[in-house]
Regions:
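Helix-to-loop junctions at the C-terminal end of transmembrane segments
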Residues: 122-137, 334-347, 433
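A membrane-interface helix-boundary motif in multi-pass transporters
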Residues: 139-141, 222-237, 429-451
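Helix-loop boundary and gating motifs at the non-cytosolic
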Residues: 54-116, 282-312
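Multi-pass alpha-helical transporter architecture, strongest
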Residues: 241-249, 445-465
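Juxtamembrane intracellular "pre-TM" segments in multi-pass secondary transporters
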Residues: 14, 40-66, 252-286
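Structural signature of the two symmetry-related core transmembrane helices
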Residues: 140-156, 350-365
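Central cavity-lining transmembrane alpha-helices of secondary-active solute carriers
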Residues: 109-130, 322-337
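Glycine-rich segments within core transmembrane alpha-helices of 12-TM secondary carriers
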Residues: 118-120, 199-221, 415-426
């Protein structure tokens, strides 16, 4: 469909991404518009091309790659605004409006759990299917567009739903569809981005993710009195942005490439990556799962926390945007610093460990200060921690992928660790609250332990410093 980027010569064959020289030797800083030389910095627009590890080539971080970096950040923002607005604001309010205050926690836990398991199954399937896809538009774009289109229709179904069963069915379709968009989108990083600049790339991509997740909560609160309109707006935004992303960053046609025959055993293995054969992948998955869970277990449930734990009741919705802005402030600071700093130092793991410690510390404030002030401090400090983690997360994950031929499938498995905690957070939190007799206090010490475990989980990773 298009020719390879003029700025990034096409690599002769796909190879396993490897650590760039600046991750194993003297650190090099990478700035937008700069030029670097690295053994694996060849860039190709071909959908099956990974980052080359052949002879050193100059890579200019500008032109098509810069456009890809910026537009992928916006694409993440659009999709994750749905994950911020719907399970964090719109869905809890819709459930509360149907079942009432007394049954809202348990009911939301059930709906969230069902949807989360749908997401868990959809992610690796989406990756595997996109890896096998042959089309004039490449292997990622068709599924990204189809995902946001079907997901948008499902959100309209949620807007029209007036029973819990209808909501649950529509929410399952939303989870599956948007994960079919999100999985192939995330696979673009190892497909088309040089390893040496993945930290900076991941920082911008992670910034879009966080702006979407937190901005979605802020915007979602604005639709508290008109939930169906909110669903319509977020569905339209995702559709528009993803279509523009595909148009602005086209892949070459891959219709002439061989497609392996479908194998049921191989398909079932999609859901399993051996921790014995690929321990770095296992620890990367575990760290991401725990850090996301520790963060979203409180952030994703903060509407009910504000209502019942802080005691704001009707004023809780108005406080959500305030907390979102504070969290965004912390996120902006740490994200814009963390990724480039990681590239400069040539280290990822230390940033993850620091981020996990900050996240754990943030949860202390609402525990000892069950007030609006305590929640405001939590919002800013947790934004610092999670933003720091997001700034290096994608880069770190891309370095532990076990196979050069199954980028999207493996990233689909890894994305379970991000999507599952975020969508399941209301369910986990609701189950804890119900188990302790409608008491919210245990959420915070449990979150602290989970965040700390997530931080230290990256220590055994050997392929990344």
């Amino acid at each position: 469909m298009t020719t390879p980027s003029d700025d990034f010569p096409e690599s002769p064959r796909p190879v396993q991404p490897t650590l760039p020289p600046n991750l194993s030797g003297a650190p090099d800083s990478v700035a937008l518009g700069s030029t670097l030389t690295t053994a694996d910095s060849a860039f190709s627009a071909a959908p099956t091309s990974a980052v080359s590890a052949q002879s050193p080539q100059k890579v200019r971080v500008r032109g098509k790659l810069l456009k890809l970096m910026l537009s992928m950040s916006v694409a993440n923002l659009a999709i994750f605004s749905i994950w911020g607005a719907v399970p964090g604001i719109l869905l809890p309010l819709q459930v509360e409006g149907i079942v009432g205050d007394g049954a809202k926690a348990g009911t939301l836990a059930i709906v969230a759990t069902i949807g989360a398991f749908a997401a868990m199954v959809a992610q690796p399937i989406a990756g595997m299917v996109s890896d096998r896809t042959r089309s004039r538009f490449g292997r990622r774009a068709p599924w990204m567009v189809a995902g946001v289109l079907i997901g948008g229709l499902a959100l309209l179904g949620m807007a029209a739903a007036n029973t819990i069963v209808q909501i649950a069915i529509a929410w399952v379709i939303v989870q599956i569809a948007y994960n079919f968009a999100q999985g192939p989108l995330s696979a673009i990083l190892p497909d088309r981005v040089p390893s040496a600049v993945r930290g900076t790339f991941a920082a911008l991509s992670g910034l879009g993710l966080m702006l979407g997740a937190l901005g979605g909560q802020i915007a979602g609160a604005a639709f508290a009195s008109s939930i169906p309109t909110g669903y319509l707006v977020f569905a339209g935004l995702a559709l528009l942005v993803i279509v523009l992303f595909v148009v602005l960053n086209p892949d070459k046609s891959n219709r002439g490439e061989p497609k392996p025959p479908f194998n049921l055993v191989a398909f079932l293995k999609t859901f399993w990556v051996s921790p014995v054969k690929h321990p770095d992948f296992f620890w990367g998955f575990t760290g991401r799962l725990l850090l996301f869970a520790g963060y979203f277990m409180v952030t994703g449930y903060q509407l009910y926390i504000l209502q019942d734990y802080i005691g704001l009741k009707g004023g809780a919705v108005a406080m959500v945007p305030v907390l979102g802005i504070l969290s965004l402030g912390g996120t902006l600071i740490s994200t814009l610093i963390g990724g480039p700093l990681s590239d400069k130092l040539g280290r990822r793991k230390i940033v993850v460990i620091i981020a996990g410690g900050i996240l754990a510390a943030s949860l202390v404030f609402p525990l000892v200060m069950p007030t609006v002030t305590g929640m405001m401090i939590f919002a800013f400090v947790s934004g610092l921690g999670f933003g720091a983690y997001q700034s290096v997360d994608t880069a770190l994950m891309s370095e532990v992928l076990p196979s050069k031929d199954d980028f999207a499938k493996d990233l689909g498995v890894l994305n379970i660790a991000a999507t599952l905690p975020q969508t399941l957070a209301p369910g986990i939190a609701g189950a804890i609250v119900v188990a302790f007799g409608q008491v919210y206090t245990p959420l915070f010490p449990i979150g602290i332990v989970i965040a700390l475990l997530g931080a230290v989980a990256v220590l055994p990773i050997k392929s990344v410093r």
